[in-house]
Amino acid sequence: MERPCAWKKYTPQQIEELEELCRGYKHFLSENKTERLCVKAGIKMAEEAGYVDLETVIAEGRELKAGDKVYAANHGKDLMLVNLGTAPLEQGFNILGAHVDSPRLDLKQNPAFEAGDMAYLDTHYYGGVKSYHWVASPLALVGVICKKDGTTVDINIGDKADDPVFTISDLLIHLSSEQMSKPAKDAVDAEILDVIVGGRPVKFDEDDKDAPKEPVKQMFLDILKEQYGVEEEEDFLSAEIEVVPAGPARDMGLDRSMILGYGHDDRVCAYPSMLAQINVTNVERTSITLIVDKEEIGSVGATGMTSRFFENTVAEIMTLAGEGSPLALRRALARSRMLSSDVSAGFDPGYAAKFETKNAAFMGRGLCFNKYTGSRGKGGSNDADAEYVALVRDIMDKAGVDFQTCELGRVNAGGGGTIAYIMAKYGMNVIDSGVAVLSMHALWEVANKADIYEAYRGYKAFLERA
């Protein structure tokens, strides 16, 4: 049951639609390298499409009815878009869910130090990373510094053409014999992933008893104060600054068929999900798109999928729509259908031994469906019902969407998980779906434009027809 390459069927008009979609996606990916920025961009997209903040609806005491469109944000890191359908909410929702946190390095709370006449920022990695990926590459600092007076300073240094960039040094090959003999996981110690941010000291009188003990670090702090209004080093205690690859997403391949960028996992699913949501109108079953944080570290915390944000927001909406009983809420959740959208491992001929080709995701063959994920005996996975898989197949076929079914590599080769099992706890039908990528969790991942286009088409069809 080999699936065909999606590119072979496209008309000139479809190629134009594909390129337009991917231009928007490249811009989104390049400009929004943190979960906060993704949510902010998602809110802008929603408001331009006529969505209203749920908090405004609640404050004004308005009722909700079919055709109303609302959004809710959670700590600036989660976003839920809701388009109310004509059917009673108790009959359930059609839900898309993706995450917008990506593997990265986070600054520690007390990060700044000086060594060897250079200023550094100490980091702690976030998510599943290979430490050796992060050395000798241009890096950017993106995030927020929250000050005690209640103001927030936005930090975004390294992505503009005239910005300085940062890096983590690597050991020169001439002195690397011991390093090169280590397993890859030990070649670069995660504790030494320290970002070089300066190499010039402030000027001072050597005899001045108040002269800074770390003059290069002081120069870095002085520039932060002058250019960003960060008054004191202690403001790092209440900061969330992420170290991410510097530079934009770009077309890849001489035929421009792919996109190389940071954060395809999982913004390559989040962006087409949001776009499908705002482009679907006059639905029967209420459509919901959920964009969440913390998936890469287990979906924990107030902004992870295990929080009550989704359930609480649904309860608010059902109450405003006149269906506010606890039983109606439980029925609505259990009767819902969901595509849990996350990336899949694209077949890589260079590492073919890690894949079983009958059930592998191939680049350019369309939207991926993973009936189950997990590892070593499907541990920790959601396993979609056969009846639900049949329903999803029917929706995709009737909409002419190219799709493929796949697993995350050979049996016992490894594995992974998504938010699917968390949503399935409500009793709803959930299946994992998404886009195949190469070099998953590396600084620069690869996605095929045809797969992004088919993902958008598939998500839109699901919201309209499920």
Model-identified regions with their sequence ranges:
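N-terminal hydrophobic/helix-forming segments and targeting peptides
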Residues: 1-466
